């Protein structure tokens, strides 16, 4: 699972997930998976999508993960009364805005990468689309 090695503070405010994304172009690979809705991706969801891509391309080519879960989400234990402070960190999420490139692939055919990204998109809670690198 992805999570930061160390952070300045253990817990974080809930905050908002507004605005447009940074990192909207395919930069490293030839094909990318772009988010078209906003949401929060858990580290487990990012990892399961990565596994789906790896299995689909049969360990050929190269994969880049362009998102990292850096926001801790806390949860209080079951049947605990309100108050007594904020709960413990339960999992880590990455905030995703529309237009953000989530994964990139190179070294495989476009047809195979479309299949791989379709399998990965089924594991993610945001709507996605397949994009190719713009060659100038």
From Swiss-Prot:
Q: Cite the GO molecular-function annotations of the record.
A: rRNA binding; structural constituent of ribosome; tRNA binding
Name the source's superkingdom: Bacteria
Name the Gene3D superfamilies for this protein: Ribosomal protein L10e/L16
Matching entries from InterPro entries are given as: Ribosomal_uL16, Ribosomal_uL16_bact-type, Ribosomal_uL16_CS, Ribosomal_uL16_dom, Ribosomal_uL16_sf
Q: Which keywords belong to this entry? A: Ribonucleoprotein, Ribosomal protein, RNA-binding, rRNA-binding, tRNA-binding
State any GO BP term from the record: translation
Q: Has the keyword tRNA-binding been applied to this entry?
A: yes
The role this protein plays is: Binds 23S rRNA and is also seen to make contacts with the A and possibly P site tRNAs.
Query: NCBIfam families of this UniProt entry?
Result: rplP_bact
List the PANTHER family. Answer: 50S/60S RIBOSOMAL PROTEIN L16, LARGE RIBOSOMAL SUBUNIT PROTEIN UL16M
Question: What family does the database annotate?
Answer: Belongs to the universal ribosomal protein uL16 family.
- What is the designated name of this protein? Large ribosomal subunit protein uL16
């Amino acid at each position: 699972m992805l999570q930061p090695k160390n952070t300045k503070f253990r817990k974080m405010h809930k905050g908002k997930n507004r605005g447009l994304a940074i990192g909207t172009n395919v930069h490293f690979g030839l094909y990318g998976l772009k988010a078209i809705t906003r949401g929060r991706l858990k580290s487990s969801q990012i990892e399961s999508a990565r596994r789906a891509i790896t299995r689909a391309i049969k360990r050929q080519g190269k994969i880049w993960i362009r998102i990292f879960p850096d926001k801790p989400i806390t949860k209080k234990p079951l049947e605990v009364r309100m108050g007594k402070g904020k709960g413990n960190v339960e999992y880590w999420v990455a905030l995703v805005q529309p237009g953000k490139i989530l994964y990139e692939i190179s070294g495989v055919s476009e047809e195979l990468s479309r299949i791989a990204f379709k399998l990965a998109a089924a594991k993610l809670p945001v709507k996605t689309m397949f994009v190719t690198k713009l060659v100038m």
